[in-house]
Amino acid sequence: MVAASFETVAIGAHQSEDRGARDVKWRGGPMIEHMPVLFAAGLGQLPETLASGIVNGCIYALAAISLLVVYNVTGVINFAVGDFLMAGAMLTLLFAGPNGDPHRLPLALAVVLAVLIVTVVGALLEVLVIHPRRRYGTIFLLILTIGISSLLEGGALIPTGSLTYGLRPFTNGPAVSIAGVLLPRQDFWIVGSTLIVMGLLWYGATRTRTGKALRACEVNPTAARLVGIRVDRYWTIAFALGALLAAFAGAILVPVTYATYNMGIPITLKAFVAWILGGVESPVGAVAGGVGFGVLEAVVLGYSPASVANYGDAVPLLLLIVVLVVRRRGLTRRLVVTRV
């Protein structure tokens, strides 16, 4: 039944008029609809390239913040973040269906329900899988998150197969022209949502008891326990919040690309690079790193020959090597010494 539902989504998505004449092949990362092959087009397409990079970067930024939240509270690098994003995208597709299917849920409700389900799954995985094995150390837990990633990927493969799926934009209508640059309406949802999430995180961290308790667990877990904070509970909250952020990123991403069961690992890698670029403890840095990486990726792939662009997934690896070479002392000390 579920597989049949996804088949309907796939057929409808490829026939959608709202998605225009686009035929973007998923290559392991968000490929925004207005990113053409720019090698022959020259600098005339630079504004569109930068716009694509910023939109891509916002998705990477949300995933990077997810990594940051989990790491700051627990010391665990969650390599399942991309698959939480994939789950959010796939569940949104399943619940909403393409082109306003009257037999499916309204789009807004589909997004909320998908994000809530992934959030609960994230919390349950922490309680049932991560938490009982904390004493084995952070390296073991990191490897465990890779196993969770494989589990989520396999779980998505069973009902969806290896097909790609698409969703209509949140707001229908032609692209908006700003200073001569055509911007699809979904881009405004992505950028605006990222800014709103940043504002909500700042408010939550500085104005709510839960946020302050999370920060206390981050700064000094022992002292937090002494003042009555249940650190174990906030491990669960951190994983749930990380899953929520990733799932929301997947839900707002899927209208501008095609989703597939194996989209998670490349996004995890890119989010990890963005997180490292921005500093492992700074939410603002994670956003800056995500947007910066997105722009760099767009420029490199956009102005490269097709033979080079086909190896686009190597960009984050090369950038990570450069960052670790240039700032090797600061980054490694921060990642290792802080959590001993």
Model-assigned labels for residue ranges:
Residues 82-87, 126, 133-157, 264-276, ...:
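Pore- or pathway-lining transmembrane helices of multi-pass membrane proteins that form conduits
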Residues 182-260, 283-289:
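Helix-loop-helix "hairpin" substructures at the membrane interface of multi-pass membrane proteins
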Residues 2, 7, 14-17, 23-63, ...:
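Membrane-interfacial amphipathic/re-entrant helices at transmembrane-helix boundaries
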Residues 43-59, 183, 204-209, 236-275, ...:
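Inter-helical junctions in multi-pass inner-membrane proteins, predominant
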Residues 35, 132-133, 138-207, 231-237, ...:
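Transmembrane helix-bundle core of multi-pass membrane transporters
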